[in-house]
Amino acid sequence: MQKLIVANYKMNGDVEFYKTVQQTIKNLKVKDTELVLCPPFVYVPNLKINRTKISIGVQDIACEETNKCTGQIGPNMLKEFGVTYAIVGHSERRQIGESNELVSKKVLTSVSNGITPIICVGEQSKQSSLNVLKTQVQIALSKIKTDKFVIAYEPVWAIGSGEIPTNNQINKAINIIKETTQKMGYNNIKVLYGGSVNENNYKDLLTTAADGFLLGGISLKLDKFFALVEGVDNA
């Protein structure tokens, strides 16, 4: 299966940074790997990338299409700027009260408008039961009838901590996610791994069942980030 790499820039960067991304990415050499760049909303217009296998995403999306959503940005607005992916349910959104039910609404809004949601799921601590993954997936997909989505497994305790699960733990989690989607009638779904992925461990993580990565911090180190992307493509 073709690998997918998603760069979540979170609340980082400025106009000059995204100009550098725009220029640097022209020299990126990828053949079989798809790359999605997710800058903050205000910098989406700064990334006009006319290349196959490189797409623009966002870090959140409105939960409804109504115009009565102060502070939200709807799918039709995003599509005007070439957005084709949206991260939904990231742990940092869940930490400020975003529920499984709200995630499911955002998933519906995305797929109803031709935007592919990247649905984030993950357990809070090393001791947490992985059954939470099953619940998160089932509720997230409860309102849709399409396989146009991606799931990103991010153990919350690993994000930005420098710690990562063992490969066996990652495989166990991904197997639970894929078994859940298969029982719901969705086959061949991409499941990414996210959480402290860097230039030193990505090759080992490629031996897991993950279909790619959701990246955070390393996305800001452009030389290392693009080297990682090319390394995945050549693996």
Give a label for each model feature.
Residues 1-235:
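Active-site loop-to-helix "anion-binding N-cap" substructures in soluble metabolic enzymes
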